[in-house]
């Protein structure tokens, strides 16, 4: 299973938390962890040791910003927004499929069902976040002029068909679109505007559960998608928004305690890994 992340040093522990949650809840197999980074992470050794303890292979990818010399770059549009969109240019060419995950997610059931989703005829698989009304969806379609897409996809969980993406997704198209449009969420807007019609929709209640909307999920499911249902069935919880469960404040929510449990286990894992020299970490 190939996993992709894009972080800086502030999110090493959060990334390790995601990895631990995947390892504990996904059937044993090989995990290859690719991490896009603007500069080599100062906590590279921490991450390497954690991956070794989890039995995962760690592949850091330092991004050369010269790749984006023709891209529109401003304070609002830093080069890092292009990493996810152009991951196929940065990853080894012999990779065929990879799952991108934001570092603010938690895996609570087997990830294999998402990873094994067929992408035949599609560039990506992603989820559209549920709402009680479709007002936001209509606004986004008008804003991005992508009326033939199923909806507005959240790019925090993105299964990538790299072989097809390499043929269809071009940096010049992305740069030109950003240059000629004012965007709210630059990389996510580009993904939806240019490639929304080529994204396979997967259920957000399973693969990209927005933890802010637990009440909405229960309402639209007529009471079926309760906390117990989520714990049995949902694969990925996504801690969207400004409130984050690892913050000392602004960390309320029905799934905060669950995250804190994994986060605490991760800190213990990191501490244990630091006590061992690299050659003794298995």
Model-inferred region functions:
Residues 43-90:
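Active-site-proximal specificity loops/subdomain of glycosyltransferases
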Residues 105-142:
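Conserved donor-nucleotide/metal-binding helix-loop-beta segment in metal-dependent transferases, i.e.
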Residues 21-29:
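Short, acidic, metal-binding catalytic loop of nucleotide-sugar glycosyltransferases
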Residues 98:
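Short aromatic/hydrophobic "clamp" motif used to bind/position activated sugar donors
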Residues 101:
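Catalytic metal- and UDP-sugar-binding loop of GT-A-like glycosyltransferases, i.e.
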Residues 146-157:
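A recurrent flexible, glycine/aromatic-enriched loop bordering the glycosyltransferase active site
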Residues 1-7, 162-282:
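A glycosyltransferase accessory/donor-loop signature
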Residues 31-38, 126-128:
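Short internal beta-strands
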């Amino acid at each position: 299973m190939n996993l992709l992340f894009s972080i800086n040093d502030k999110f090493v522990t959060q990334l390790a938390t995601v990895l631990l949650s995947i390892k504990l809840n996904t059937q044993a197999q090989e995990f290859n962890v690719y991490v896009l980074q603007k500069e080599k992470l100062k906590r590279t050794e921490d991450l390497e040791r954690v991956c070794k303890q989890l039995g995962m292979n760690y592949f850091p990818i330092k991004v050369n910003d010269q790749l984006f010399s023709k891209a529109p770059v401003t304070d609002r549009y830093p080069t890092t927004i292009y990493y996810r969109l152009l991951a196929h240019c940065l990853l080894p060419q012999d990779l065929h499929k990879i799952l991108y995950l934001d570092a603010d997610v938690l895996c609570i059931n087997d990830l294999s069902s998402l990873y094994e989703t067929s992408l035949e005829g599609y560039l990506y698989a992603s989820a559209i976040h549920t709402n009680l009304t479709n007002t936001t969806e209509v606004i986004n379609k008008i804003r991005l002029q992508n009326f033939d897409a199923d909806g507005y996809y959240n790019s925090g969980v993105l299964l990538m068909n790299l072989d097809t993406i390499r043929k269809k997704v071009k940096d010049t198209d992305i740069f030109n679109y950003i240059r000629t449009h004012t965007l709210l969420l630059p990389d996510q807007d580009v993904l939806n505007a240019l490639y929304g019609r080529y994204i396979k929709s997967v259920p957000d209640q399973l693969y990209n559960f927005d933890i802010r909307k637990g009440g909405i999920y229960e309402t639209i499911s007529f009471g079926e998608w309760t906390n117990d249902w989520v714990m049995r069935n949902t694969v990925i919880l996504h801690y969207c928004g400004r409130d984050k469960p690892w913050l000392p404040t602004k960390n309320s929510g029905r799934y905060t305690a669950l995250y804190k449990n994994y986060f605490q286990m991760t800190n213990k894992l990191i501490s244990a890994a630091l006590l061992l020299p690299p050659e003794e970490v298995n």
